[in-house]
Amino acid sequence: MANPRVFPLSCVVQQYAWGKVGSKSEVACLLACSDPLTQISEDKPYAELWMGAHPRGDAKILDNRISQKTLGQWIAENQNSLGQKVKDTFNGKLPFLFKVLSVETALSIQAHPNKELAEKLHLQAPEHYPDANHKPEMAIALTPFQGLCGFRPVEEIVTFLKKVPEFQSLIGEDATAQLKKSMNEGSGAMASALKNCFSHLMKSEKKVVVEQLNLLVKRISQQISNGNSMDDICGELLLQLHQQYPGDIGCFAIYLLNLITLKPGEAMFLEANVPHAYLKGDCVECMACSDNTVRAGLTPKFIDVSTLCEMLDYTPSPSKDRLFAPTLSQDDPYLSIYDPPVPDFTVMKIEVPGSVTEYKVLTLDSASILLLVQGTVTAIIPSVQGEIPLSRGGVLFIGANETVLLKLTVPKNLLIFRACCLL
């Protein structure tokens, strides 16, 4: 009998403290729906579902015809299943990690190094930078999803410096004056002034940060209790972040970074060196296979301030420019493609109406991982005359050049995300 190259996966859950708790978490719900034997603990966070072959979360293969236990082991012995170009380009490894995230409290403000810097940092400090790879990533919202991403337009930051004296006192008069002046001097001057402002903020004394933050929290709380809106200085968000990370420098970053709320299906792409933080909501995320993170705030972990201030991309841009729009397929009315400007990964969104009885998954010269978010199907695999039932939360590995047909077993709409590598 032919060696199966399409099979279901049991994926690793990460229970980080910032995750949504119990059945409020989309990660937990996907898990429970795909495996009725799963017991969800209503007092534990379910933060991330890892779908891939990363050593810290290698998916288990759910097919007793296959001797290898995990996807990583199987790919190592079946490298042709990656597709010829993917195999050659990425040294016989799956180049992406596919995830679902359920965020309750803010993740740290962070940026990921480009390949050149990642190699240097890994050599210098492997305990903080565990590999030499870059880590571009893309988040696609499943529910309304809030995050910080990239530096705001300079005029917005200047407005906050006027309205939030506590913020201005940390940035300092000279850096504030330089930023205002840069508005008439072009993009290079603005980036340089932003770097100066951010560096001043990050290098502020802890004692001074705590004092100014306490003053600001008190002022906002009083105004809100008097019935006044503080939306013009993101008052509610500041209180929320301060409650989660009291006295943390990252609370002030909301005045420097764009606040973005993605609607379901909207995406943001996070290139190397762009500062960002996920604040709340559920998303599908795809990234290059790396663990390198340079943190800036909203974290009790190690902060490498000098590396961070040097590496960041200080290009200001409005929040709408941070949205990453998919392209609609010319040949398939149900297919949208999120194809970022990096070779490591592409994500496809498939939305099939319940009135359709069968859907042919696009055959690719790339290994792919398919996640069923909504619906119930039977996957038909002609190469081995096999059938695999999949319900909500089901995850399927599809080897390169394999044909898969999905039969809708219940007449309900399908929502599927599929990660692959289009070289």
Curated annotation (Swiss-Prot):
Cofactor: binding comment: Binds 1 zinc ion per subunit.
Q: Where along this sequence does the record place binding of Zn(2+)?
A: 110, 112, 137, 276
Q: Name one GO biological process term.
A: GDP-D-mannose biosynthetic process from fructose-6-phosphate
* Entries under PROSITE patterns matching the protein: PMI_I_1, PMI_I_2
Q: Where in the cell is it found?
A: Cytoplasm
What does UniProt give as GO cellular component? Answer: cytosol
Q: Name one GO molecular function term.
A: zinc ion binding
One of its Pfam families is: PMI_typeI_cat
Q: Which UniProt keywords apply?
A: Acetylation, Cytoplasm, Isomerase, Metal-binding, Phosphoprotein, Zinc
- Cofactors per UniProt? Zn(2+)
User: Which reaction is recorded as catalysed by this protein?
Assistant: D-mannose 6-phosphate = D-fructose 6-phosphate
What positions does UniProt annotate as the active site of this protein? 295
Q: Does the keyword Hydrolase apply?
A: no
* Record's keyword annotation contains Cytoplasm: yes
Residues the record lists as N-acetylalanine modifications: 2
Functional pathway: Nucleotide-sugar biosynthesis; GDP-alpha-D-mannose biosynthesis; alpha-D-mannose 1-phosphate from D-fructose 6-phosphate: step 1/2
The EC number of this protein is 5.3.1.8
Q: Which domain of life is it from?
A: Eukaryota
PANTHER family the record matches: MANNOSE-6-PHOSPHATE ISOMERASE (PTHR10309:SF0)
General function of this protein: Isomerase that catalyzes the interconversion of fructose-6-P and mannose-6-P and has a critical role in the supply of D-mannose derivatives required for many eukaryotic glycosylation reactions.
For this chain, the family text in UniProt reads:
Belongs to the mannose-6-phosphate isomerase type 1 family.
Q: What is this protein called?
A: Mannose-6-phosphate isomerase
Q: Which organism is it from?
A: Rattus norvegicus
What gene name is listed for this protein? Mpi
